[in-house]
Swiss-Prot record:
Its main location: mitochondrion. InterPro entries: Complex1_LYR_dom, Complex1_LYR_LYRM2. Involved in efficient integration of the N-module into mitochondrial respiratory chain complex I. One of its GO terms (biological process) is mitochondrial respiratory chain complex I assembly. Disulfide bonds: none annotated. This is LYR motif-containing protein 2. It is found in: Mitochondrion. Residues 1-19 form a transit peptide. The gene is lyrm2. It comes from the Eukaryota. Belongs to the complex I LYR family. Pfam families: Complex1_LYR (PF05347).
Amino acid sequence: MASSRLPASALTLKQFIQRQKVLSLYRNMMRTIRQVPDEGDRKYLRDWARDEFKRNKNSTNQDAIRMMITQANMHHDELQSSLALANVKK
């Protein structure tokens, strides 16, 4: 009998793609947060984002993860819009 070469903990293709989306979103969020001019606000947002991602790190429900990705994208877009408006008003 041939056994699989993949370890039992290997991700499925869907899980792998979803993981890449989450990592990309996290990196984009951190890049956007770096643009926040006030150091205190920047630290607060960075800590908030890290805590949110860390809190949901062990989620396995695909639908819940998709919903969290959608919410995080909305927060990211809102932050980018706020930064754009703040730069226009200067």
